[in-house]
């Protein structure tokens, strides 16, 4: 019989995704058939699953941790926030429409059947399913029709382990408060809790564990330290762009403007891991640094809206000066579209604005269309003559004179565009920096040595390290019951 456990947080960004990945790798290392599952995710960081649909990148990473192919059923409902049209709803890997907040609340009960179907598919043949909640079950204003947290747990009869983040402070209050606010039927689902992101002497929290026990009766299944290896994993939430230091004083500065609807920003993680690269996330109100050698414009879930905001920040003028100084620019997906001369949206897919002038750094135009390209791809860099792998998730078609200088071929067809002087390029291929040979060639063209590290191997070894740390700190009796 398949066992299941669900990790829910006392709030957002408490570390659930990493813990689920760590538990999946721990179970896989013990020889179990383990699968990750998240009923509902909200993220513009999407991946293309092995069966050809869209899922959250966290679930893609968790499938890697479990050493199993990724599937659309591991994340049956994915919400991708857009601009004034609310969120795009991805159901079992395919676009199912758009919905604003209240519309989605009304839609949720209708999605439960698909969620349970996917859970059944993921569970089939598995020894263990590790489920991840979303946000917090204490948001009782969203409890009616819930499919992300306790609504799913009660319907599927999956026991819950709460995760509290001690690093942000107030973890005792968050756990006790969650106990106080949950209705009795939800409270009964909680088997215990984990403390996450602890720094220092764990014994100093002994009295805290006792206090939580007095108020709630819940057992503590472990105090998890700050997992340093997690810094080598792809980040899921854009909140990390505000927190992570990405080096300073290095040989090459790479600037990344943080678009308001930034998507798939983990494209930058392999560059951040390079010893001689300083990755600078440029937030609204800041200028693009004058000493950057490369500017990367990342993906966007709302190209027209982000293009308007790009100009409002004055980044268009900064970028023009950067190119005049001899700097390089790479646009990925939505960032590629932004670099062109025009973006048209005749059907209003992104919103009410039908057309906008682009930055004009590439002689190309983009027209949005309802058909969405979603696929994993093998590619070849025509610029550097090396192979690479990645994926495509985009709407629209881009054409123009600079497409004659396509920087890559994807599955044998030309993709992207390059300016005549070679300083500006764009492509629809996500994940290109994760290919070690391409990254090394790119960095060499920018005057530094790099790309020697195997990025994918680094991610895999980080998962093993996290699993080993969890095995050392989690309650042994609970872990043995869970893993059998």
From Swiss-Prot:
Entry annotated with the keyword Secreted: no
Q: Which Pfam families match?
A: CbiA (PF01656), GATase_3 (PF07685)
InterPro entries attached to this UniProt entry: Class_I_gatase-like (IPR029062), CobQ/CobB/MinD/ParA_Nub-bd_dom (IPR002586), CobQ_GATase1 (IPR033949), CobQ_N (IPR047045), CobQ_synth (IPR004459), GATase_3 (IPR011698), P-loop_NTPase (IPR027417)
Pathway involvement? Cofactor biosynthesis; adenosylcobalamin biosynthesis
Keywords from the named record? Cobalamin biosynthesis, Glutamine amidotransferase
**Where's the GATase cobBQ-type domain?**
251-438
Q: Supply one GO BP term.
A: cobalamin biosynthetic process
Q: Give an example GO molecular function.
A: ABC-type vitamin B12 transporter activity
Active site residues according to the UniProt entry = 333 (nucleophile), 430
Where on the tree of life does the source sit, at the highest rank? Answer: Bacteria
What PANTHER family does UniProt report for this protein, alphabetically?
A: COBYRIC ACID SYNTHASE (PTHR21343:SF1), DETHIOBIOTIN SYNTHETASE (PTHR21343)
Entry function: Catalyzes amidations at positions B, D, E, and G on adenosylcobyrinic A,C-diamide. NH(2) groups are provided by glutamine, and one molecule of ATP is hydrogenolyzed for each amidation.
What HAMAP family does its record include?
CobQ
Q: Which family does it belong to?
A: Belongs to the CobB/CobQ family. CobQ subfamily.
Q: Under what name is this protein listed?
A: Cobyric acid synthase
User: What taxonomic lineage is listed for the species of origin?
Assistant: Bacteria, Pseudomonadati, Pseudomonadota, Alphaproteobacteria, Hyphomicrobiales
């Amino acid at each position: 019989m398949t066992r299941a456990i669900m990790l829910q947080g006392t709030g957002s960004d408490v570390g659930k995704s990493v813990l689920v990945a760590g538990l999946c790798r721990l179970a896989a290392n013990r020889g179990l058939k383990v699968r990750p599952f998240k009923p509902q995710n909200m993220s513009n960081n999407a991946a293309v699953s092995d069966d050809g649909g869209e899922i959250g990148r966290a679930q893609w990473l968790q499938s890697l941790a479990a050493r199993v192919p990724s599937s659309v059923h591991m994340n049956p409902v994915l919400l991708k926030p857009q601009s004034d049209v609310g969120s795009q709803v991805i159901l079992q890997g395919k676009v199912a429409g758009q919905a604003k907040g209240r519309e989605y609340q009304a839609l949720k009960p209708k999605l439960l059947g698909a969620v349970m179907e996917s859970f059944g598919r993921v569970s089939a043949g598995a020894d263990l399913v590790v489920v991840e909640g979303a946000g917090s079950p204490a948001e009782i204003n969203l409890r009616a029709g819930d499919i992300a947290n306790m609504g799913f747990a009660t319907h599927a009869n999956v026991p819950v382990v709460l995760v509290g983040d001690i690093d942000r402070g107030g973890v005792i209050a968050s756990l006790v408060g969650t106990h106080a606010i949950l209705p009795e039927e939800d409270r009964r689902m909680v088997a215990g809790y984990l403390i996450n992101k602890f720094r220092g002497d764990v014994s100093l929290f002994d009295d805290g564990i006792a206090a939580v026990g007095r108020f709630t009766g819940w057992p503590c299944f472990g105090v998890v330290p700050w997992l340093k290896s997690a810094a080598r994993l792809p980040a899921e939430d854009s909140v990390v762009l505000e927190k992570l230091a990405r080096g300073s004083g290095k040989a090459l500065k790479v600037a990344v403007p943080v678009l308001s609807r930034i998507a798939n920003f983990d494209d930058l993680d392999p560059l951040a891991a390079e010893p001689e690269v300083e990755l600078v996330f440029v937030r609204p109100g800041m200028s693009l640094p004058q000493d950057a050698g490369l500017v990367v414009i990342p993906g966007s879930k709302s190209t027209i809206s982000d293009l308007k905001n790009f100009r409002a920040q004055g980044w268009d003028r900064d970028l023009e000066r950067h190119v005049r100084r001899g700097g390089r620019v790479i646009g990925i997906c939505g960032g590629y579209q932004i670099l062109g001369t025009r973006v048209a949206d005749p059907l209003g897919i992104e919103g009410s604005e039908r057309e906008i002038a682009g930055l004009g750094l590439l002689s190309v135009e983009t027209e949005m269309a309802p058909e969405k390209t979603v696929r994993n791809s093998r590619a070849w860099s025509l610029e550097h003559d090396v192979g690479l792998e990645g994926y495509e998730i985009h709407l629209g078609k881009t054409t123009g004179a600079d497409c004659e200088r396509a920087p890559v071929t994807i599955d044998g067809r030309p993709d992207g565009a390059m300016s005549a002087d070679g300083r500006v390029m764009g492509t629809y291929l996500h994940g290109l920096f994760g290919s070690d040979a391409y990254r090394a060639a790119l960095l060499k063209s920018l005057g530094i040595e790099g790309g020697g590290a195997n990025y994918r191997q680094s991610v895999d070894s980080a998962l093993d390290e996290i699993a080993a740390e969890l095995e050392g700190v989690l309650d042994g009796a609970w872990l043995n019951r869970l893993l059998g």
